[in-house]
């Protein structure tokens, strides 16, 4: 069953029905558009929320992230930010795959419907024109036939009139014959117009309009199928991101399970342990023996009052550092050597300072080596550059290295005084001579920074930091991993400096995120590169 056969006389109904279908497409587009606006606003609000509660760089809150419960909250914020990104992706895909496509299809349907209705209108106008011609021919035939009948009656009357002349009778008969002939022509024309109209009407109702109605039916069915696809796509768009949203939710759950209350307590101890011994018992001062009072006051080495540890009331609470404490320095606080800190914290700060300066020295040595190689290239190929132009940079790098070596030795001596570890720090780099250029006589780039206690009196500390090896040990040591990570999503690693990874792959973390959103990792085969921090779950070694 089709429209052309069953609804041949329902042109107005089909006109309204097809228009209603186009209105539905437009309505659905507006609905999806408003849905995308809601998703965009929702994602924006989620991002603002995570930004509001995320710790600012260098703030106290960021320092608190060393505790697992604080880090878990930060992980939840990161997962929420990724979740917001998925909501944005839903809105973007709905806009592109549904709204844009349906809008384009709607314009095509409007043009097609307009064309079909225009064809129907032309056929209708053509049939009406034929009917008008038929009606005119019919009226003319009717009028001429009446005139012919009148002429015939007049001729008969004239013929019977005794007073009429022969000429009058002949003239009346000729007029009647002429009218009859004209009436016959009109009759034939009317018959021809009637035949033509009947043929056109048959063509109109049995061929032209059914074809047009069937085309409208085909157009409407295609529209309905397209709408069905749009309805399915509306759900599929969100369903496609559900696995990633599930990963985000799993990450939030994982953040909660990774909280370790006992470990947080240990971190607090490690962070704030002073290293001081608890105060001992106070000696009894016998004031009843007046003669020995002065000698007792001078001989006793105990504090004259208790150490105030907790509160402000001197009679009830104690504070570790008060004005009379034997630990309070008489001179200004030495912040450079961290002598103002408790012993345990001082050792940690000194070790951290040594590690930071060691990394900085390594960078300067790498830069000096690169400048030396560049200078060699310029000397061999003058057209590539002037070797003398590198002298300022080489000199500056050498000064920086000398300064850092001196600072490093100073901090290592302080660490030794504080009872810290005195193990040396090794670097994998080629030895650098005093002017900063590459030394071709060096067998290996490894150099060892010794603490001052490890040097003899005759040894120059600035020269004793180098240790030579054989030529075959030229390869650089790999940085020690500081943790590991598990990939949450696939990452192609197509950009320079990045590395690809597959979901679930475990990689070693070499360098943590510096705030730019990238973490440096290494595979078991030695391949290194950067990955997006948000694409992996990262666990750093404690």
UniProtKB/Swiss-Prot annotation:
The keyword Cytoplasm applies. The F-BAR domain binds the phospholipid membrane with its concave surface. The end-to-end polymerization of dimers of these domains provides a curved surface that fits best membranes with around 600 A diameter, and may drive tubulation. Residues 480-541 form the SH3 domain. InterPro entries: AH/BAR_dom_sf (IPR027267), F_BAR (IPR031160), FCH_dom (IPR001060), HR1_rho-bd (IPR011072), SH3-like_dom_sf (IPR036028), SH3_domain (IPR001452). SUPFAM superfamilies: BAR/IMD domain-like, SH3-domain. Homodimerizes, the dimers can polymerize end-to-end to form filamentous structures. Residues 1-264 form the F-BAR domain. It is found in: Cytoplasm, Cytoskeleton; Cytoplasm, Cell cortex; Lysosome; Cell membrane. GO terms for molecular function: lipid binding. Its main location: cytoplasm. It comes from the Eukaryota. One of its GO terms (cellular component) is plasma membrane. Keywords: Cell membrane, Coiled coil, Cytoplasm, Cytoskeleton, Endocytosis, Lipid-binding, Lysosome, Membrane, SH3 domain. Residues 67-259, 335-423 form a coiled coil. One of its GO terms (biological process) is endocytosis. The keyword Thylakoid does not apply. Belongs to the FNBP1 family. This is Cdc42-interacting protein 4 homolog. Required to coordinate membrane tubulation with reorganization of the actin cytoskeleton during endocytosis. Residues 340-417 form the REM-1 domain. Pfam families: FCH (PF00611), SH3_1 (PF00018). PANTHER family: CDC42-INTERACTING PROTEIN 4, FCH AND DOUBLE SH3 DOMAINS PROTEIN. The record marks 166 as: Mediates end-to-end attachment of dimers.
């Amino acid at each position: 069953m089709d429209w052309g056969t069953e609804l041949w006389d329902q042109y107005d109904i089909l006109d309204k029905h097809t228009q209603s279908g186009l209105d539905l497409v437009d309505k659905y587009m507006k609905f999806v558009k408003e849905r995308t606006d809601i998703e965009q606003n929702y994602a924006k609000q989620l991002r603002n929320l995570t930004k509001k509660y995320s710790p600012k760089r260098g703030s106290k809150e960021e320092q608190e992230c060393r505790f697992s419960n604080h880090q878990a909250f930060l992980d939840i914020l990161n997962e929420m930010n990724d979740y917001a990104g998925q909501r944005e992706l839903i809105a973007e895909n709905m806009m592109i795959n549904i709204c844009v496509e349906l809008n384009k299809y709607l314009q095509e349907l409007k043009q097609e419907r307009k064309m079909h209705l225009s064809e129907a209108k032309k056929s209708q106008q053509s049939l009406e024109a034929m009917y008008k011609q038929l009606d005119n021919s019919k009226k003319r035939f009717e009028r001429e036939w009446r005139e012919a009948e009148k002429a015939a009656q007049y001729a008969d009357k004239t013929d019977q009139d005794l007073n009429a002349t022969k000429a009058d009778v002949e003239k009346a008969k000729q007029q009647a014959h002429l009218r009859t002939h004209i009436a016959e022509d009109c009759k034939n024309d009317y018959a021809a117009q009637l035949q033509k109209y009947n043929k056109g009407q048959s063509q109109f109702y049995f061929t032209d309009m059914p074809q047009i109605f069937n085309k409208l039916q085909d157009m409407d069915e295609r529209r309905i199928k397209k709408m069905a696809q749009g309805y399915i796509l509306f759900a599929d768009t969100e369903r496609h991101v559900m696995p990633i949203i599930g990963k985000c939710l799993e990450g939030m759950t994982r953040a909660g399970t990774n909280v370790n209350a006992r470990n947080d307590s240990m971190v607090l101890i490690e962070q704030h342990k002073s290293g001081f011994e608890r105060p001992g018992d106070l000696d009894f001062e016998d004031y009843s023996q007046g003669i020995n009072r002065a000698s007792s006051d001078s001989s006793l080495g105990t504090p004259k009052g208790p150490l105030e540890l907790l509160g402000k009331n001197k009679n009830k609470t104690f504070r570790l550092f008060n004005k009379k404490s034997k630990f309070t320095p008489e001179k200004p606080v030495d912040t450079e050597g961290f002598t103002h800190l408790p012993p345990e914290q001082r050792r940690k700060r000194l070790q951290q300072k040594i590690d930071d300066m060691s990394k900085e020295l390594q960078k300067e040595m790498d830069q000096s080596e690169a400048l030396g190689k560049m200078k060699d290239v310029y000397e061999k190929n003058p057209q590539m550059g002037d070797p003398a132009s590198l002298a300022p940079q080489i000199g500056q790098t050498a000064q920086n290295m000398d300064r850092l070596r001196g600072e490093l030795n100073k901090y290592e001596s302080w660490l030794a005084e504080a009872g810290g570890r005195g193990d040396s720090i090794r670097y994998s780099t080629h030895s650098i001579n005093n002017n900063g250029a590459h030394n071709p006589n060096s067998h290996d780039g490894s150099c060892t920074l010794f603490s001052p206690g490890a040097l003899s009196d005759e040894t120059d500390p600035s020269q004793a930091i180098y240790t030579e090896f054989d030529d075959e040990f030229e390869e650089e040591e790999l940085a020690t991993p500081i943790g590991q990570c598990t990939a949450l999503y696939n990452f192609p690693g197509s950009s320079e400096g990045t590395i690809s990874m597959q979901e679930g792959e475990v990689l070693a973390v070499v360098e943590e995120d510096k705030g730019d959103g990238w973490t440096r990792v290494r595979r078991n085969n030695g391949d290194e590169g950067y990955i997006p921090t948000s694409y992996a779950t990262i666990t750093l070694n404690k």
